[in-house]
Amino acid sequence: MISFENDYSEGAHEEILRRLAEVNKEGITGYGNDSYCESAKEKIRQACKCPEADIYFLVGGTQTNQTVIDSVLQSYEGVIAAETGHVASHEAGAIEASGHKVLTLPQLEGKIQPKDVADYLNQFYSDGNHEHMVFPGMVYISHPTEYGTLYTRGELAELSDICQQYHIPLYLDGARLGYGLAVEDTDVTMEDIAEYCDIFYIGGTKVGAFCGEAVVFTKENAPRHFVTLIKQHGALLAKGWFLGVQFDTLFTDDLYMKISKNAIETAARLKEILKEKGYDFYIDSPTNQIFVEMEDEKLKELEKNVRVSFWEKTDEKHTVVRFATSWATDMRKVEKLGEYL
């Protein structure tokens, strides 16, 4: 059985394993107050060219989104997101459970359009009853999106301008950020994200780490007592060094970007194979997530040897499935998948 089910099936990159083994019995102070976390933060600041950034390490994506959004928003505020955004669809109501409404907008290939955001905000404040409504207090996007698509630099700049006009933060979910930045023809860099986004996080769980996400507040805008708020959300890891060592390793010698490229290269080969086999793509994703419509009978046969991820039904006899590559995907497994297809 080979797996293309997701990009978090493997453990961690070998260099992370080596570093963790080295420090395993060192006796390191807790809660992220250690030299490894500080070193990782400084390396991330350098990668973002954002020396004033405040950085915090959390364990997982949904936990990070809930903690950040709940800590930044007032009790009467909600967060604008695409109807297909992770916070709106695959986080089990985590944002709503913390008391905030997800204000959904239509998506185009997984992305919210700057014009739609501007129109929503304009209409909200033009409504004479808006004091009786949930205020839009943040714009949430992910890069890559749920469909593996990417924002352009121009789109990020537009969204940033709109958010500044209405004095609300632009928050970018970077669970798969490395894979988005590794695409050859993208015009978005880590520096651009730090420039245009008020808050973003760098995903480790899906990009080479055992677990961990690095939250970056780019404009000295972290909520007061944010560590306390992290703790309040049950998200503060006592062994914080475990995350610090991993991110310190990922941001040494450009390892984060080097291993991200493997996911893009193996995904490109997989797309070639799928095209050769005559499969229809549900959406044109340039990153490591590939969405294909398959006949249910063919899918049933494929799943005897390959794990893939269910996405949605298109009709009674067809299903959209997702193939995901990662930093750890072996090209030989891609070729083997081609035999099963």
Describe each model-derived feature in a short phrase:
Residues 151-183:
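Catalytic PLP-binding core of fold-type I/II PLP enzymes
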